[in-house]
Amino acid sequence: MQDLRLILIVVGAIAIIALLLHGLWTSRKERSSLFRDRPVKRTKQERVETPIESLDEGVGEVRVRTSHPQEKPSFNHLDDDDDEVPVIQHAETKSAQVKTASRQAPFASVQTDYDDPLLGGLSAEQPPHDLSRDPLLGKADESYSQPQHAEPPHVEKPAHQVAPQQHVESQQEPVAPAPEAKPQKLKETVLVLHVAAHHGGVIGGEVLLQSVLQSGFQFGEMGIFHRHLSPAGSGPVLFSLANMVKPGSFDPDTMSDFSTPGVSMFMMVPSYGDANQNFKLMLQSAQRIADDVGGVVLDDERRMMTPQKLESYKARIREVLDANTIA
């Protein structure tokens, strides 16, 4: 315990000594800063007091004019003029005329010390604030008054511009040729293939139904079979299959008792997707059905299919697609 007390006493003494030293150091620092500022204050006071001490108590000439170089104007030049213009008169024996003349002298000397190109040749007797006689300001007023008269035409111009636009639109309405849409509708073609029995025979309905369903056809609208994008029957129709005999429809419930000389497959061009691929798929389906029912594939003129006829089908597809692309 005694050691702890000694330690605390020593620490407290050190802290007190440190505080005293810090206080002495700060007080000396403040004193040194005060001594440094005093010469500055004295010089400022001397500058303020020197003009009054250097003034001449006697009054000489009433009008004082000094010539200063005009090439390098500066603020010091103006300060010198201000120091020389006011004249303090301490002599009470001067007459009232001398006082009035001394009052007018600063204004005259300030106006005539140097020739200002902006002020022209104004003197103390000419009031510079008379702006009504200034030709420059008169022109400025006229220039400001002119846009007020020019504003109404600017407001009316949009009205004149709208009218031609409406007139142009009215002219373009009849120019839009409605017949251009008709050629696009005419640029369509129907590709037809037939599957017929050999030598005037007939195709049984039951065998035909099985082959048609296996080829991905689904019975649908107009009582005929349709080949959709998906064999399950979903998606757009790519091509269709109808009876070669009028009215061309089928009845799936009575297909077992049905027979026909052949069926017709047809597709529209342009169609969904690639027309060439759709035609290739239709040709493959026709060949498959022909093989299943024991028939043959015929062209749109009911003739035997030849390579030349296939090229003519492809040419028709290209012609329609190119025409629609140009349109």
UniProtKB/Swiss-Prot annotation:
Q: Which Pfam families match?
A: ZipA_C
Positions the record marks as coiled coil are: none
Q: Which InterPro entries match?
A: Cell_div_ZipA, ZipA_FtsZ-bd_C, ZipA_FtsZ-bd_C_sf
| Superkingdom in the source lineage | Bacteria
Mostly located where?
Answer: membrane
Per the record, the GO terms for biological process are:
division septum assembly; FtsZ-dependent cytokinesis
Record field: compositional bias (Basic and acidic residues): 60-71
* Region span, Disordered: 60-182
This protein's GO cellular component annotations are: cell division site; plasma membrane
Compartmental location: Cell inner membrane
Q: Which residues lie on this side of the membrane: Periplasmic?
A: 1-5
Q: Sorted alphabetically, which Gene3D superfamilies does this protein's record hold?
A: ZipA, C-terminal FtsZ-binding domain (3.30.1400.10)
The residue spans the entry assigns to the Cytoplasmic side of the membrane are as follows 27-327
Purpose of the protein? Essential cell division protein that stabilizes the FtsZ protofilaments by cross-linking them and that serves as a cytoplasmic membrane anchor for the Z ring. Also required for the recruitment to the septal ring of downstream cell division proteins.
Q: Which family does it belong to?
A: Belongs to the ZipA family.
Q: Which HAMAP family match?
A: ZipA
Annotated PANTHER family: CELL DIVISION PROTEIN ZIPA
Subunit structure comment from the entry: Interacts with FtsZ via their C-terminal domains.
For this entry, the protein name equals Cell division protein ZipA
Question: Species name for this entry?
Answer: Yersinia pseudotuberculosis serotype O:1b (strain IP 31758)
Organism placement in taxonomy: Bacteria, Pseudomonadati, Pseudomonadota, Gammaproteobacteria, Enterobacterales
